[in-house]
């Protein structure tokens, strides 16, 4: 198995994940809508799935407001000022003071945390939807979310849940950008071609007619592992950055961890592997 298979097996052993490890013959019988190479190994994680992101964000906001949080939307943050008895978060509309600050700024992390300059790359990542037979590739038909590790890179997808069809994207690759405010959201023909080639080989019954596309950004650390730490400028600032395309699924756990770090509570985790100064 490749790096992906070995990583899943190691995680399964460490965290007691419910998985089925099968050869390609068994996988072909179970999921005939996928075309597996003869030398592939397949793992099915029974409790895995996918998130409805906008619904999840709304739920987080609702729960936070219920707990007393105030939302200030539409502010552009200029800096988090240190040196005083309180930290100051300076925006284009007003200044907030706080005993501690959590920074989860994604592609803008290095703008607020100078120690991250040169440690992060921002990648433009196109996402694509394709027309697909609902009897084969829909969530209601039992089509699983999937990730293929192939000779041309890693590709993932989610079953169809609406009229847009099957969602597919390339996890590897990407187009490096320097300014997230100038992100070009137009279709990249080369990236579309890579995804189309993957579909022809491994999901041949999916239409090559794309129904939609959008663009997101990965903020990638040097080793593709999260950076979770206190800021060098002031220990009262805690942050998570460089989530490398995996951040949202960990949002609940990261939020709880960062809140405990900011308030000085014990969290019980060894964060050495995620420190900004790791080697």
Language-model region placement:
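Dinucleotide-binding Rossmann-like beta1-alpha1 core, especially the glycine-rich loop
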Residues: 1-30, 154-155
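A general structural signal for well-ordered alpha-helical segments in protein cores
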Residues: 2-8, 24, 56-57, 109, ...
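A short, glycine/Asx- and small/polar-enriched loop/turn
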Residues: 3, 31-39, 81-88, 220-224, ...
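Short glycine-/acidic-enriched loop or helix-start segments at secondary-structure transitions
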Residues: 5, 31, 82, 112-114, ...
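Flavin (FAD/FMN) cofactor-binding core of flavoprotein oxidoreductases
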Residues: 13, 20, 24-29, 50, ...
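Helical element adjacent to the flavin cofactor pocket in flavoenzyme catalytic cores
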Residues: 44-100, 104
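Active-site catalytic microenvironments for nucleophilic, acid-base chemistry
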Residues: 63, 108-111, 115, 257, ...
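Active-site substrate-recognition segment that forms the wall
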Residues: 100, 107-236
């Amino acid at each position: 198995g490749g790096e992906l298979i070995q990583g899943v097996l190691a995680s399964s052993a460490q965290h007691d994940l419910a998985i089925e490890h099968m050869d390609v013959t068994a996988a072909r019988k179970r999921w005939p809508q996928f075309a597996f190479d003869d030398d592939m190994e397949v793992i099915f994680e029974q409790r895995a799935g996918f998130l409805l992101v906008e619904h999840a964000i709304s739920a987080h906001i609702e729960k936070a407001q219920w707990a007393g949080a105030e939302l200030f939307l539409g502010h552009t943050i200029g800096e988090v000022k240190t040196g005083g008895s309180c930290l100051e978060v300076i925006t284009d509309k007003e200044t907030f003071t706080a005993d501690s600050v959590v920074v989860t700024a994604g592609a803008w992390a290095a703008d607020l945390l100078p120690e991250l300059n040169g440690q992060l790359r921002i990648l433009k990542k196109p996402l694509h939807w394709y027309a697909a037979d609902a009897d084969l590739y829909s969530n209601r038909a039992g089509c699983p979310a999937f990730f293929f590790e192939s000779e041309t890179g890693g590709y993932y997808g989610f079953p169809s849940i609406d009229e847009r069809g099957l969602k597919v994207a390339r996890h590897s690759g990407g187009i490096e950008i320097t300014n997230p405010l100038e992100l070009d959201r137009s279709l990249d023909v080369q990236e579309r071609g890579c995804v189309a080639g993957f579909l022809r080989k491994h999901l041949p019954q999916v239409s090559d007619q794309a129904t939609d596309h959008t663009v997101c950004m990965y903020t990638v650390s040097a080793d593709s592992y999260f950076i979770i730490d206190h800021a060098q400028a002031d220990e009262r600032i805690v942050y998570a950055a460089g989530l490398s395309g995996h951040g949202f699924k960990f949002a609940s756990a990261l939020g709880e961890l960062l809140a405990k770090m900011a308030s000085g509570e014990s969290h019980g985790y060894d964060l050495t592997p995620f420190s900004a100064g790791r080697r």
